[in-house]
From Swiss-Prot:
Pfam families reported in the protein's UniProt record: MraZ
Residues in coiled coil: none
InterPro entries: MraZ, MraZ_C, MraZ_dom, MraZ_N, MraZ_sf, SpoVT-AbrB_dom, SpoVT-AbrB_sf
Main location: cytoplasm
Keywords, comma-separated and alphabetical: Cytoplasm, DNA-binding, Repeat, Transcription, Transcription regulation
tRNA-binding is among the record's keywords: no
A single GO BP: negative regulation of DNA-templated transcription initiation
UniProt superkingdom: Bacteria
Residue span(s) of domain SpoVT-AbrB: 5-47, 76-119
Record's protein name: Transcriptional regulator MraZ
Amino acid sequence: MFLGTYTPKLDEKGRLTLPAKFRDALAGGLMVTKGQDHSLAVYPREEFTALARKAAAASRSDPEARAFVRGLAAGTDEQHADAQGRITLSADHRRYAGLSKDCVVIGSVDFLEIWDAQAWQTYVEANEENYSQATGVALGEIV
């Protein structure tokens, strides 16, 4: 499970060091794709494969699903962390997420999100008041 908030730096070559506690879960390969709210999503290869297959199965008859699958496939880069736990983010991914040197990596249970540090702070501040309401939506009657 991916949990927590981390603040790695993006180096001049576009490399980002993944948090050490997640490296074993990502050792089999990982997929970096465009996420929501101009973040990047990082999935373990197996998790991404299941997601992509599910989306592809629905896409044959639904134009919106086909568009999603096309965007997902075109915007995804397969990666393997190097010996120092770094991955290289493509220029397209860095541009999409507006990444500068200061980044934030957050755990989102079954995947990671990579944010520009300022964009993450803005997002947190804008959504702080909605957290209670979102809890009810996400968890329903459990809470």
